Structure formats: structure tokens, C-alpha cells
Amino acid sequence: MSIRYNSRLVAIDDDDESLQRVPQDLIESVGLSTLCFGSAEQFLESEARHKAACLIVDIRMPGMSGLELQAKLKAEGCRIPIIFITAHGDSEMRTLAMGDGAVEFLTKPFNDAVLLEVVHAALERSGND
């Protein structure tokens, strides 16, 4: 079976399932599809790494962090647009994430309209690759 890119699939990677639901419900409410993962390792082992049009990821997770995931994907030549959402961000983390090509770095709690705007910007970016 060949892997096909899906321009409407958003991957969400957060170790807290309850915090996956908020962006998942919001994104699905505008007709986009989502897949949720509880760790960077789960995302890397899935076909979503090749299919998703963008990735929403938490910075701090057990095992591989969101920043480490971003670096690994970049090193492998994967150009999936990444949106970071975190409750534990600081200016240094933001600088690292944005410097490595993140679409945005949002702090929890985030504004729903802002997240949707950023997701649409990420989807546009992925369509231009």
C-alpha cells in the first residue's frame, strides 16, 4: 500500500490525552481530520509522519521532547509544518522552535481563533512544498 499525503490531516502530539481533545475537537469542527499521539516516538512510528499536512506538538513530553522531534524530522528531510503548543514555554524555547522553522509557538491556554488561523497557515505552507 502506498502512502498518500493528505492535505486535510492534522497530527496532534501531546502526552496528556485531555489536552489532545481541545485542539482535536476545534480542528475537526472546521472539517479537517486529526490523528492524536501520546509521544514523539508514537508519531515517528506511524504513517502520519508521511501523511499529515501539519503537526501540532507539545514541547515537554516524556521521552523525546517536541524540540527534539522537530530536530529529528528536520535532519531526516521531513518538512512537515510544526505548531508548538505548550504550558511551559519560555523565550529561549520559542527562539529555538521558530529558528528551526516552526509555524508558530503558542502557549496554553490558547485562543481558538488564533489556533485555527495558524493551522490554516501551516496547511498553506505544506501545500507549497
Where are these regions (language model features)?
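Conserved acidic segment of CheY-like receiver
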Residues: N6-S18, P23-I27, L55
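C-terminal output helix
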Residues: E92, F110-H120
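Acidic catalytic/metal-coordinating carboxylates
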Residues: G38-S39, S65-E68
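Alpha4 helix (beta4-alpha4-beta5 surface) of REC/receiver domains from two-component response regulators
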Residues: E68, G89-E104
